Amino acid sequence: MIILGIESTAHTFGVGIVKEENNSIKILANVKDTYIPPQGGMKPSELARHHVEQAPIIVKKALDEAKVNMKDIDGVAVALGPGIGPALRVGATVARALALSFNKKLIPVNHGIAHIEIGMYSTNAKDPLILYLSGGNTIISIFFDRKYRVFGETLDIALGNMIDVFVREAGLAPPYVVNGVHQIDICADKGKEYVELPYIVKGQDMSYSGLLTAALKLLSKRNLPDICYSVREIAFDMLLEATERAMALTGKNEILVVGGVAASVSLKSKLEKLAADRGAELKIVPSQYSGDNGAMIAYTGLLAAKHRVFIPIEKSIIRPRWRIDKVDIPWR
């Protein structure tokens, strides 16, 4: 079985192709193009325009890289949510067009579930406590009774979004990442003094908006590297407190980190210490799968297709607020 997957939930348009043969799964292609705004944040209309322009190019590149054509494809998987509406619509439209034109099954995929599943596949995690950390999501989850249950999450903005907004407003970005290192880490590593900022954890839930607002107000008053250092340390320590509490509650001895923030070296260092203290194993999704990508959609689509999870074209509406705990998982 060969599945083509389309990702377009935010700033990335990606296409992945995954093949299963003789119970062996291989990722044949994982091609993407990410939109970086010249200034400011992401504007939905600009994202949609980027995706429309890149879609035919990325689809062709993926097929060429995989050395297959659409006749070889058994199903088209697409991320229908959560995400930014105009961006989601482009991916959904491309997926519908391919499915109709080549008479292929259409497979609905939840973007967050795809992040988790590619993490499970690439790290060989078995039954972990999952930290899903990205620009739009900060979720602590486990799998139980056919669903990924949420044990903790952000009460307002996501960890990744908070950090991105801060470095942008501080004049450090774009670009947000330089040679694989986020601007917050580049700046924070020069900091020496801790600046007191809001630290808000409620049970296993976190709130990052107060931290962001307070840090921005200090930009003209304190040394920038010190503010960066304090923002990073407080933000990650909030997550660690919630994570440790969730580990105690669930009894898990394995931590899986997925999503774009999983690439943070400083967060990895903190989580390694936490895992060691609790006798747990830390597993982090490889960098090529941490950010948004088409391979994770194709892989999750493959799992879904094997359990006959398809959707008619007329019902393939986008779901910008589609939570991971609302998705039934028949393959686990």
Swiss-Prot record:
Biological-process GO terms, alphabetical: tRNA threonylcarbamoyladenosine modification
Q: Name one GO molecular function term.
A: iron ion binding
The record's section on Pfam families has: TsaD (PF00814)
What are the subcellular locations of this protein?
A: Cytoplasm
Q: Which cofactor does it need?
A: Fe(2+)
- Please give the chief subcellular localization of this protein: cytoplasm
How the cofactor is bound: the record states:
Binds 1 Fe(2+) ion per subunit.
Q: Per its UniProt entry, which superkingdom is the organism in?
A: Archaea
Signal peptide positions on this chain: none
Q: Which reaction does it catalyse?
A: L-threonylcarbamoyladenylate + adenosine(37) in tRNA = N(6)-L-threonylcarbamoyladenosine(37) in tRNA + AMP + H(+)
InterPro entries referenced in this protein's UniProt entry, alphabetically: ATPase_NBD (IPR043129), Gcp-like_dom (IPR000905), KAE1/TsaD (IPR017861), Kae1_archaea_euk (IPR034680)
Q: Which sites bind substrate?
A: Y132, L133, S134, G135, G136, D164, D185, S264
The positions annotated for binding Fe cation are H111, H115, Y132, D292
E.C. number(s) listed in UniProt: 2.3.1.234
Record's keyword terms, sorted: Acyltransferase, Cytoplasm, Iron, Metal-binding, Transferase, tRNA processing
Q: Please give an example of a GO cellular component term from this record.
A: EKC/KEOPS complex
Family, according to the entry, reads as follows: Belongs to the KAE1 / TsaD family.
What is the documented function of this protein?
Answer: Required for the formation of a threonylcarbamoyl group on adenosine at position 37 (t(6)A37) in tRNAs that read codons beginning with adenine. Is probably involved in the transfer of the threonylcarbamoyl moiety of threonylcarbamoyl-AMP (TC-AMP) to the N6 group of A37.
Q: Which NCBIfam families match?
A: arch_KAE1 (TIGR03722), gcp_kae1 (TIGR00329)
Read off the PANTHER family from this record: TRNA N6-ADENOSINE THREONYLCARBAMOYLTRANSFERASE (PTHR11735:SF14)
Q: What is this protein called?
A: tRNA N6-adenosine threonylcarbamoyltransferase
Source organism per entry reads Sulfolobus acidocaldarius (strain ATCC 33909 / DSM 639 / JCM 8929 / NBRC 15157 / NCIMB 11770)
